[in-house]
């Protein structure tokens, strides 16, 4: 799957003709504030409220760090195919600055176990931190302790989200192949989002790293592209803002959040808060195909 950044003279032409739905880029100016608010809302009377509130603290720290130390705009040469590909992008040391700031922000509120994790990361060498980041980015999650992974990923994501702001945002997908991973950075999604507003009813996958969204047609598996064995599962609630889409062909599942049911849903926050749905899917022998940045596979 490739994306193409349109020159100015093509933008109006494309707007008046049929094209694939555009890529959507998150704005860090409001992404983190909205997510933190949603996490705190979902934490009310939740069995895992403490962890949801911890996640909100991390997101608020991302927001603060972005405001105080934004990534300086640099002229980049972007490839057409996944311009910020995690496997090839020469990331700078800026993400480690973000990690240090994140740890410093969270430490005063951390419990004893978390302080041990923070101390370990603060003492780690640059080489060790880069090694751990490499492992996470190529999905070798078992090589990184899950408590460390949350902080490292939060710093990497803050870095990658800002990189997307330097890509001209009039970009389209050239084809519909290999849609399971992000066309911008090649990371896996956290969940699907069924949109409302101008994109009413369209399904987008939301990237777990750079927070971009790309369109994938509904009623087909986001992993194997099959459509015959799809089923949808939800927890019994009034709104059912979150459902799991399971595929009987490849035995994977990915959750979907519905903006039309609740305009304040957030793919990361609502996916995390619906962890009991994950437990049900695992009991039914389905494997999660996405990644929530606050729930890494255990060692």
UniProtKB/Swiss-Prot annotation:
Protein's cellular compartments: Cytoplasm
Cellular component terms (Gene Ontology): cytosol
CDD domains, A to Z: FdhE (cd16341)
Pfam families: FdhE_C (PF24860), FdhE_central (PF24859), FdhE_N (PF04216)
Keywords: Cytoplasm
One function term, GO molecular function aspect: ferric iron binding
Domain of life of the source: Bacteria
Record function comment: Necessary for formate dehydrogenase activity.
HAMAP family (UniProt xref): FdeH
Family in the record: Belongs to the FdhE family.
PANTHER family: PROTEIN FDHE (PTHR37689:SF1)
Protein name: Protein FdhE homolog
Lineage per the UniProt record: Bacteria, Pseudomonadati, Pseudomonadota, Gammaproteobacteria, Pasteurellales
């Amino acid at each position: 799957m490739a994306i193409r950044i349109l020159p100015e003279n093509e933008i109006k032409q494309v707007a008046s003709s049929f094209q694939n739905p555009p890529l959507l880029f998150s704005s860090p100016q409001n992404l983190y504030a909205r997510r933190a608010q949603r996490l705190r809302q979902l934490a009310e009377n939740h069995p895992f409220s403490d962890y949801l509130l911890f996640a909100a603290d991390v997101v608020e720290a991302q927001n603060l760090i972005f405001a105080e130390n934004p990534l300086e705009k640099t002229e980049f040469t972007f490839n057409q195919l996944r311009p910020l590909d995690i496997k090839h992008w020469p990331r700078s040391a800026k993400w480690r600055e973000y990690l240090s700031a994140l740890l410093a922000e969270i430490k005063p509120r951390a419990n004893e176990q978390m302080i041990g994790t923070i101390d370990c990361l603060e003492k780690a060498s640059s080489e060790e931190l880069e090694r751990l980041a490499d492992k996470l980015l190529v999905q070798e999650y078992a090589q990184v302790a899950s408590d460390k992974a949350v902080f490292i990923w939060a710093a990497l994501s803050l870095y990658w989200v800002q990189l997307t702001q330097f890509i001209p945002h009039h970009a389209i997908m050239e084809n519909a192949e290999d849609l399971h991973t992000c066309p911008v950075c090649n990371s896996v999604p956290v969940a699907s989002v069924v949109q409302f507003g101008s994109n009413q009813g369209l399904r987008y996958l939301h990237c777990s790293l750079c927070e971009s969204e790309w369109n994938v047609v509904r009623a087909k598996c986001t992993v194997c592209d099959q459509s015959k064995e799809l089923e949808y599962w939800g927890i019994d609630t009034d709104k059912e803002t979150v459902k799991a889409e399971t595929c009987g062909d490849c035995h994977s599942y990915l959750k979907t959040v519905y903006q039309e049911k609740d305009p304040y849903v957030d793919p990361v926050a609502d996916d995390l808060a619906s962890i009991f749905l994950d437990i049900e899917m695992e009991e039914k022998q389905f494997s999660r195909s996405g990644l929530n940045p606050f729930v890494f596979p255990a060692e």
